[in-house]
């Protein structure tokens, strides 16, 4: 699998942003929860970890409204690969977040070497709506952490690449990457 830079798009949370780790850290620190990152074995984490709904909603609201202030960090290796990639083609992020302003600010904050004009963010509001956004932008490959989205887009000739996380380790037919180095290996880079 080799992907042209202009034909790849990325999810944000769980692929570029280490959002779930921030969720776990905040739940433990601010709400006294006793679960670990590896305990999140379902994308809908509320079905597998013990957390009060009010606490969960408060953390999610904080993460959605202020990803920078929430302390979300990039997944290791992401900044380097995305900065290199932005030199070849505009970056495209497709997120199920309800709005793009806060997460676009987070992306630009963590990609200081990339001009804002080289970053496109599409907030779809739901995972189901990612398919049409991907098709509208001519994407042939999408790096995603949610298996359900993989199954939604695969029949439409958008190849899902699943970024390994504890919640997507069930059997599936998709290509898996475990690091940004592995993502970089999928890309068609210019010959030097």
Regions found by a protein language model. Give the residues of each.
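Asp-based, Mg2+/Mn2+-dependent phosphohydrolase catalytic module
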Residues: 1, 131-136, 141, 146-192
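Short catalytic/ligand-binding loop motif for oxyanion handling, primarily in non-cytosolic enzymes
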Residues: 17-19, 24-25, 100-104, 130-131, ...
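Active-site neighborhood of HAD-like aspartate-dependent phosphohydrolases
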Residues: 1-61
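Substrate-recognition element of Asp-dependent hydrolases with the DxDx(T/V) motif
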Residues: 67-74, 78-108, 124
């Amino acid at each position: 699998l080799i992907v042209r830079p202009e034909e790849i798009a990325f999810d944000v949370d769980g692929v570029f942003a280490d959002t779930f780790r921030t969720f776990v850290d905040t739940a433990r620190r601010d709400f006294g929860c006793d679960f670990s990152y590896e305990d999140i074995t379902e994308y809908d984490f509320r079905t597998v970890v013990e957390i009060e709904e009010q606490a969960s909603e408060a953390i999610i609201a904080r993460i959605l409204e202020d990803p920078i202030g929430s302390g979300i960090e990039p997944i290791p290796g992401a900044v380097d690969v995305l900065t290199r990639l932005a030199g070849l083609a505009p970056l495209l992020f497709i997120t199920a977040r309800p709005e793009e302003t806060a997460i676009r600010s987070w992306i630009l904050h963590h990609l200081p070497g990339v001009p804002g004009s080289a970053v496109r963010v599409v907030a779809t509001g739901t995972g189901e709506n990612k398919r049409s956004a991907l098709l509208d932008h001519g994407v042939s490959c999408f790096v995603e952490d949610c298996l359900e989205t993989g199954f939604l887009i695969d029949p439409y000739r958008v190849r899902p690449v699943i970024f390994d996380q504890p919640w997507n380790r069930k059997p599936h037919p998709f290509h898996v990457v475990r690091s940004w180095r592995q993502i970089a290996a999928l890309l068609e880079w210019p010959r030097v």
